[in-house]
């Protein structure tokens, strides 16, 4: 399914009319003077709904993930994603087949930190591909919002250079199945690392104002693959070429003596 001529204004109108953000959530309003419209960017407040605590940027409230996915199979999902410049039907099982996976959950399109992260991962995509890692961005925005954002020049806050797909989780089912749906109705800023068998190896959550580290994400994939290949475990600050440990007491003693003595 290919869409052309999707305007930024109509896309933002669509997302604002479809996102069921709770009560008085003032989501992401910064004036885009170049386009003479308001786009989403800064959360200012959320009133208490059904006993949920008030949220403000100063509190940095994060919804607790009730159950960890680490060590379990990643939930599979289908839907619409933006791939290059086309909107396509997406199947996670097909996309991540025989590959490691990085799911980059982010709050919303047209925001501050999110485009810097997505483009940061995108410019290092070759490093992920060399490790057989496929990257996918996920948010609750509409496919039309993704497309409008992708069509917007980077100098205007867009993500036009983006090289990996953006999945549209408008139903919130994907974010919910991963335990990453915030009370405000959008996803946590979170990274999910998956091995080739579809098992979740690492989940990281970040406050809305904190951007992720691409280098740290690559280091974690190196550690996952090293442990799989050798059967060894990776100690603190491990990176490729560093000493590792066998999972036994003698190896631990030797490592600690060499490293901290």
Segments predicted by a language model, with ranges:
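Chalcogenol-based redox active-site neighborhoods
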Residues: 2-19, 25-31, 37-261
């Amino acid at each position: 399914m290919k869409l052309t001529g999707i305007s930024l204004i109509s896309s933002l109108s669509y997302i604002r009319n479809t996102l069921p953000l709770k009560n008085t959530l003032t989501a992401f309003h910064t004036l885009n003077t170049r386009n003479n419209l308001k786009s989403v960017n800064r959360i200012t407040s959320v009133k208490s709904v059904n006993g949920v605590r008030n949220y403000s940027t100063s509190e940095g409230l994060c919804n607790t993930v009730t159950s960890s996915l680490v060590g379990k199979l990643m939930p599979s999902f289908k839907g619409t994603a933006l791939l290059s410049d086309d909107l396509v039907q997406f199947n996670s099982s097909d996309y991540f087949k025989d590959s490691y996976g990085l799911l980059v959950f982010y709050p919303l399109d047209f925001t501050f930190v999110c485009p810097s992260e997505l483009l940061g991962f995108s410019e290092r995509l070759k490093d992920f591909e060399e490790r057989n890692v496929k990257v996918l961005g996920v948010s609750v925005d509409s496919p039309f919002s993704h497309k409008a954002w992708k069509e917007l020049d980077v100098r205007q806050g867009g993500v036009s250079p983006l090289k990996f797909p953006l999945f549209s989780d408008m139903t919130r089912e994907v974010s919910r199945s991963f335990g990453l749906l915030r009370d405000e109705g959008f996803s946590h800023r979170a990274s999910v690392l998956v091995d080739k068998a579809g098992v979740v190896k690492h989940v990281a959550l970040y406050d809305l104002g904190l951007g992720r580290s691409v280098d740290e994400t690559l280091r974690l994939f190196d550690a996952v693959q090293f442990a799989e290949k050798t059967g060894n475990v990776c100690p603190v600050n491990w990176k490729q070429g560093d000493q590792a440990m066998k999972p036994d007491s003698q190896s631990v003693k030797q490592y600690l003596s060499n490293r901290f003595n």
